[in-house]
């Protein structure tokens, strides 16, 4: 059976959202979704962006990008077993994976935050992240500290 004329797979691209035309906003949106309720996720995200606009008087898309950039980790630690012992081995991660982790940490931190609704908690967490504060920033620093402490095991890949 010849493989010469097989169909080429096209690379899947993420769509951009209708208002901001940003793939990053769409990535955040898809991580907000719970139980398939995309319209609720849209409402939460767009209201949070509106609150950011009112609080900071800056472009909310720039604030979102800055917050994700501040929270994005460069290193993570993974458990590896070697001769009966488990080591926390630091790994460098790809930029896209770091971005995904940053979005996840921002959402986790905003869900744990005290506040009346998800929109205000998420907008506050994003604003804090741009200022270098907040639980998501603390999570990144904690991860980097753990990677630095276990740097001796970096060759146990």
From Swiss-Prot:
One of its GO terms (cellular component) is small ribosomal subunit. GO terms for molecular function: rRNA binding; structural constituent of ribosome. It comes from the Eukaryota. SUPFAM superfamilies: Ribosomal protein S7. Keywords: Chloroplast, Plastid, Ribonucleoprotein, Ribosomal protein, RNA-binding, rRNA-binding. GO terms for biological process: translation. It holds the Pfam family Ribosomal_S7. Belongs to the universal ribosomal protein uS7 family. One of the primary rRNA binding proteins, it binds directly to 16S rRNA where it nucleates assembly of the head domain of the 30S subunit. This is Small ribosomal subunit protein uS7cz/uS7cy. It comes from Welwitschia mirabilis (Tree tumbo).
């Amino acid at each position: 059976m010849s493989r010469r004329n097989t169909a080429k797979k096209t690379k899947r691209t993420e769509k951009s959202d209708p208002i901001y035309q940003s793939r990053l906003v769409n990535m955040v949106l898809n991580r907000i979704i719970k139980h398939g309720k995309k319209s609720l996720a849209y409402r939460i995200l767009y209201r949070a962006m509106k609150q950011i606009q009112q609080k900071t008087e800056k472009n909310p898309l720039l604030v979102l990008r800055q917050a994700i950039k501040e929270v994005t980790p460069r290193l993570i630690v993974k458990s590896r077993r070697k001769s009966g012992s488990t080591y926390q081995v630091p790994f460098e991660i790809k930029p896209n994976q770091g971005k995904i982790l940053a979005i996840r940490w921002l959402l986790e931190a905003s869900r744990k935050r005290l506040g009346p609704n998800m929109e205000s908690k998420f907008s506050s967490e994003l604003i804090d992240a741009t200022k270098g504060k907040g639980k998501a920033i603390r999570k990144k620093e904690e991860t980097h500290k753990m990677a630095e402490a276990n740097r001796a095991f970096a060759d146990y890949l």
